[in-house]
Amino acid sequence: MYDNLKSLGITNPDDIDRYSLRQEANNDILKIYFRKDKGEFFAKSVKFKYPRQRKTIVADNSGQGYKEINEISPNLRYVIDELDKICQQEQVEVDLKRKILDDLRHLESVVSNKITEIEADLEKLTKNR
């Protein structure tokens, strides 16, 4: 699993925290950040440079002109797919935690309102006697 990341020398993909991608001239710069250990001020990171792939395509539908375009390297695309799986998995876990906390707060509110309602009913019963 995560063969493309391992081919970059990343032995523990689960330690990845996030990544950034930017274009610089004819290169894409990928920077991968790892989780900080306790006591560290800065997260460890590694940087990779990928040359952009050049393609010549038809410029218009008549087939008369061509233009050259640059696009992301296929290898980089595979690496990004793996990084997205890792980073989105963490986001799903955070979202689930937030959902559970929201559900808990809602349950707390419902129970509190029900207790208030029952206490009011009890108060009515004791006043009627």
Curated annotation (Swiss-Prot):
Lineage top rank: taxon: Bacteria
Task: Identify the Pfam families for this entry.
Answer: DUF3461 (PF11944)
Q: Which family does it belong to?
A: Belongs to the UPF0325 family.
What the entry lists under HAMAP family is as follows: UPF0325 (MF_01519)
Q: What is this protein called?
A: UPF0325 protein PC1_0937
**Any coiled-coil ranges, and where?**
none
